[in-house]
Amino acid sequence: MNSRVFNFGAGPAMLPEEILKEAQEEFLNWRNTGMSILEIGHRTPEIISLLSTAEQSLRELLNIPKNYHVLFLGGAARTQFAMIPMNLLRPGDDAAYFITGIWSKMAYHEANLLKKAYYLSSEEKEGFVSIPDYQKWELKSNTAYVYYTPNETINGVRFPYVPKTGGVPLVADMTSCLLSEPININQYGLIFAGAQKNIANAGLTVVIIHEELLKNQPEPVIPTMLNYKNHAEHRSLYATPPVFNCYLASKMFEWIKTQGGIEGLFQRNCLKAAKLYQYLDSTDFYLTPVFKEARSIMNICFSLCYPDLEHKFLDMANERGLKALKGHRFTGGLRASLYNAMPMAGVDALIEFMSEFAKENG
């Protein structure tokens, strides 16, 4: 009997069952080494080959040019909130931030602790339910980079466009959207993403950075573990990388190719999100706060018109195998995350349950 459930959690997220089974089969004896992937030294030929293969697969999926470095770094994506200003801001520089949700707000405050940052737009007063109007902002002349979060995981808000910066490097936190939709790498100076949404398990952060941003490092000297140039020169092997995460990521990259690539997954993701939003818009029992033009494809936030029924909703959903639908602690409410590994069957099961719950409790 298959005991797998539909995990709608914002991260760690659902992984394809076939990848989990492959990892299970290989766990005790990886590539006939007689060792688990967890036991093999990170400077062995096997692991160096694994990292090289993972990087090449990611480059193929995203069409990453040669003048960009791909880094596989250990730790939380939140570390990048500090690494970015430390590496990219020189004395006298400013950084510009779009504050469109909780994560971009945190990144802005971290940058301000370390260096000098200002915000181009803040949607907080309206409750983080919208995106700033296209190109209605003005950059300071000393702006070293522009930072934005294309998809706000907590608030369920998505940029429907890529901000124009007039040649100033664009930095993007793509933790919850990298590999879910096509992007043009050349539009960005730096992209980073925590792995626990669409890439692998928690503990790995992928960084894609243009080589020009590694030059003219600011003073004082950046600590070596927080220095992008150092990690690039050592090909992500300056310290022990999160090998198992990279192993799963490599499998995920290959899996994406079998799903029609990123374009194929994007079409599927759009259909999944559209189906759930269509249901939400058809009933007064559920409320969706985000403006339609700013709705996330990955993270669908909603609430009940009777908030006191929320615990009952979650308990009954759990019994039906619909897990992790509780919203973030900062926002409350409910949230269904529809990452790459979530099948349409999961969306159908959720809508069926929500419809039944509304009829019984409306």
Curated annotation (Swiss-Prot):
Pyridoxal 5'-phosphate binds at A77, R78, W103, T153, D173, Q196. One of its GO terms (molecular function) is O-phospho-L-serine:2-oxoglutarate aminotransferase activity. Its main location: cytoplasm. GO terms for biological process: L-serine biosynthetic process; pyridoxine biosynthetic process. Its cofactor is pyridoxal 5'-phosphate. Binds 1 pyridoxal phosphate per subunit. It comes from the Bacteria. The modification N6-(pyridoxal phosphate)lysine is found at K197. It catalyses: O-phospho-L-serine + 2-oxoglutarate = 3-phosphooxypyruvate + L-glutamate; 4-(phosphooxy)-L-threonine + 2-oxoglutarate = (R)-3-hydroxy-2-oxo-4-phosphooxybutanoate + L-glutamate. Keywords: Amino-acid biosynthesis, Aminotransferase, Cytoplasm, Pyridoxal phosphate, Pyridoxine biosynthesis, Serine biosynthesis, Transferase. The keyword Amino-acid biosynthesis applies. It is found in: Cytoplasm. Pathway: Amino-acid biosynthesis; L-serine biosynthesis; L-serine from 3-phospho-D-glycerate: step 2/3; Cofactor biosynthesis; pyridoxine 5'-phosphate biosynthesis; pyridoxine 5'-phosphate from D-erythrose 4-phosphate: step 3/5. It holds the Pfam family Aminotran_5. Catalyzes the reversible conversion of 3-phosphohydroxypyruvate to phosphoserine and of 3-hydroxy-2-oxo-4-phosphonooxybutanoate to phosphohydroxythreonine. Belongs to the class-V pyridoxal-phosphate-dependent aminotransferase family. SerC subfamily. Homodimer. This is Phosphoserine aminotransferase. It comes from Legionella pneumophila (strain Lens). The lineage of its organism: Bacteria, Pseudomonadati, Pseudomonadota, Gammaproteobacteria, Legionellales.
